[in-house]
A protein has these predicted regions:
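Periplasmic/extracellular loop-to-transmembrane helix junction in inner-membrane transport proteins
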Residues: 29, 60-91, 95, 123, ...
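Short, membrane-interfacial amphipathic segments enriched in basic
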Residues: 9-25, 354-367, 401
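Transmembrane alpha-helical segments of polytopic membrane transport and secretion proteins
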Residues: 1-39, 87-90
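Generic hydrophobic transmembrane alpha-helix motif, especially the helices
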Residues: 387-392, 397-434
Length: 434
């Protein structure tokens, strides 16, 4: 009923010769005449192609985990900078699933997947001049040097330490449920979930700090005299700052497992763990670097001619710089997203836009997992069909062998064939030749 009336087979005489046709042609003919079977075949081929061809471009490491990307809803809004900000941006920063920007008039914008607390932007901040974005909270300072924070409100993260009251702020940094602030006199203050993030301001108590960079594990500081100091309490690979760069550093950046610095002569130095070949600094940036930023597993450098060069992890195209990223005035990278603000105030972004089907509780892309699961299912199904086919050939061949052995040959006057229609009470397989 759903697929049309089934075609009736033509009634033929039992003595009428039937045209011989190979089994394969018979199968194809019956398949083409059966709309339901054809529909099933099309669906099967589509699923097969999706499971075995798409993974050529969409790779998924079965051991991959990322706590910053877990349980994310489907969508592609991570890089959706509001239109009012695209040509009027002053500062833009990224969290794991969202972005925050400030325009030249000091107004704050947010986009992406936001928690309820992230949407509660303080209304009385005045003209905001700088922001820092963490896992799920934001820091901001206005033109008077006053500090504000909103977002995640546990672990004391929403409470600004009293020692910062009346202090003017020089630099702010937001990490994984931790905030770090540098005052104008070079002192460092941190607060938040310090049990999860290894940060000790005691490491720089006798130093005048210029800026701080944090990742999801710890932080490093750059002093005003060009030295880099790790803020970790425990020994890490980031502690191994090359001696030859101390006193010569202009800019610093962090990935999850490595640190990088731009020196006064424009060269770039990377140390820590060489994940994603992060130590392989492109030759075209050496001696020409003026700024640097880092995401989870990649680095981006701005050269003196205003262009950007990126390297490291590229699973979300975070290290694939678009051609229009030129005439760069400011650079920002966070997690798997990047942004540059051009000299005319326009914005260019690249990197992770979002997830088609979201992520699971380990931060894995659900769509990629479906492709991997489909490969396994299709492989098992293919093996099962091969086994079934082999069994059919063996059993069918055995039955034919029995028939051939059980009767004389056709030349002796008795043979076998399968007519389309035969009278009731007659042997459907064998007949006497007259």
């Amino acid at each position: 009923m759903l697929f049309g009336k089934k075609k009736e087979k033509e009634q033929r005489s039992v003595l009428e010769e039937e045209q011989m046709q190979s089994p394969f042609r018979t199968i194809i003919k019956n398949l083409l005449e059966n709309k339901l079977a054809m529909g099933g075949l099309i669906v099967f081929v589509s699923i097969f192609a999706m499971c075995f061809i798409l993974p050529i471009w969409f790779h998924q490491d079965l051991n991959y985990q990322d706590p910053t990307q877990k349980n994310i809803a489907p969508g592609f809004s991570f890089l959706s900078v509001p239109s009012d900000l695209k040509d009027n941006a002053e500062v833009i920063e990224f969290g794991p699933t969202y972005g925050v920007g400030v325009d030249k008039d000091g107004y704050v914008y947010e986009w992406g997947q936001l928690t309820k607390n992230l949407k509660k932007i303080p209304a009385d901040m005045g003209k905001v001049v700088d922001i820092a974005v963490g896992q799920d909270h934001v820091l901001a300072i206005n033109d008077k040097g006053t500090l504000y924070t909103w977002g995640f409100n546990r672990m004391g993260l929403n409470v600004i330490p009293p020692e910062l009251k009346g202090k003017k702020i020089a630099d702010i940094e937001a990490g994984y449920q931790v905030s770090v602030v540098v005052t104008e006199d070079g002192k460092v203050v941190s607060w938040g979930n310090t049990s999860a993030v290894d940060i000790s301001t005691a490491n720089v108590k006798d130093e005048k700090v210029k800026e701080v960079k944090a990742n999801i594990q710890t932080a490093i500081a750059l002093t005003k005299d060009g030295k880099v100091i790790s803020l970790a309490k425990k020994e890490t690979a980031l502690d191994n700052v090359p001696e030859e760069i101390q006193g010569k550093v202009e800019k610093i950046a962090l990935t999850d497992k490595a640190a990088a610095a731009v020196l006064k002569d424009g060269t770039v130095k990377v140390w820590g763990n060489n994940h994603n070949h992060i130590f392989s600094v492109p030759e075209e940036v050496q001696g020409k670097a003026v700024d640097i930023s880092g995401g989870r597993n990649h680095l981006v450098v701005v050269t003196e001619d205003g262009n950007a060069v990126a390297w490291g992890g590229n699973e979300n195209n975070q290290a694939k710089v678009p051609a229009k990223a030129t005439n760069i005035a400011k650079l920002a990278s966070g997690y798997y997203q990047n942004c540059i603000i051009k000299e005319d105030g326009s914005v260019v972004t690249w990197g992770l836009k979002g997830y088609l089907l979201g992520t699971d509780n380990l931060g894995r892309n659900v769509f990629y997992r479906i492709l991997k699961g489909g490969q396994m299912t299709m492989t098992v199904g293919f093996i099962a069909v091969i086994i079934q086919f082999a069994i059919g050939i063996l059993v069918g061949g055995f039955r034919i062998l029995r028939w051939n052995c059980g009767y004389p040959s056709y030349a002796s006057g008795r043979g076998c064939r399968i007519p389309s229609v035969y009278p009731a009470g007659t042997d459907p397989f064998c007949f006497d030749r007259k």
